[in-house]
Amino acid sequence: MRRLLIRCTKIEWITKLIDKKRIMTTQEFLGKKEFAIQDQTVSESCPSNIALIKYWGKYDNQIPANPSISYTLNHCKTNTSLEFIANEAFSVQIFLAGNEEPKFAAKIEKYFSNIEQYLPWILKGKYIIRTENTFPHSSGIASSASGFGAVAKCLMHLDGIFSGKASEEESLRKASFLARLGSGSACRSLYSGLVVWGECQVKESSDLFAVQYPNDEVHEIFKDFNDWVLLIHEGEKSVSSTVGHGLMDTNPYADRRFQEARENFGPMKEILASGDLHQFIKLVEHEALTLHAMMMMSDPAFILMKTGTLEVINKIWDFRKETGLPLFFTLDAGANVHLLFPNNGSEETIKLFIETELLQHTQKNGVVKDIMKF
């Protein structure tokens, strides 16, 4: 009982602190009350991202319980066209790859209503949104990140027309802020390279928006990487990410996990500067497995990995032990495996191993090939 009381008191204190900071800092994103709307169609594209230090657990209004860092992918993107019809009753129609999606439209309507204070014109018309992904919807690549990122970019494009243009830096920061309110990790997709979300020792980092990790503090080995996603399971997840985040509220190991993620930023900064691949592999794989350990220690517990996930992980470990080559993995909140390896001269041997030994564990030899180059 005493432990529970201490934990609740701590959470209440943190929440009050976060609320105070949020009131002080969200003011800069409030929209202009004077605007001139018109019929307009805009189009934007936004990539997905894969986290290295994981975000799992949040407070109200998409405030992360710990900071995270991710790679932005180069090819896996969402392309979105947003048509705004001025002065019609507010409504949203959404077409994903040509098919109307009423459930997603309802979600976007709620999202638009929630961000009206930041875009005061947003409820003054009708929207027809057409969106397509360059990757399979259930591939384990975060379509919500690229999807909300693309929508946020479209909204800022419209805001520039209706309310007056902001600087490119200000517009991008506000797009990241707005994307976060739709899907937390979406805020990281607005920037290229390595991206940080959550207040930490990285300069200008914030819980409210993402910032680009300084490229001049990243060793060249980390600027040209592959991410091959093995499609172990393409069906719907048994537990959604939204539910999973919520279960961290009662997870007895949550506080230690949040502390560990913050602590991991120190070693990660040193690793990125030095080019220490061995330590990078160790930290990234540890973060991936910790994410899934949190799921298994939730109440109720749940497991998103499949048999194929574990078979692939064991084969990667055996391959690395036998060859010393830098093939390693990370996982999102699902069964599919992100295979990470640098373009450092060993990639052809690694690709051959993937194709001959790992593809057999996927559904229909499914793999999505991407790169992170910056």
Placement of each model-derived feature along the sequence:
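Leucine-biased recognition of intrinsically disordered, low-complexity hydrophobic segments
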Residues: L4-L5, L17
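Short, solvent-exposed loop/turn segments at the edges of secondary structure
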Residues: L73-H75, L190-S192, K223-F225, G334
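Gly/Ser-rich oxyanion-binding loop with an adjacent helix/lid
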Residues: T26-E28, W121-F222
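ATP-binding N-lobe of GHMP and related small-molecule kinases
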Residues: R22-S139, K153-E169, T349, Q363-F374
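C-terminal nucleotide
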Residues: D19, I23-N61, I85, S91, ...
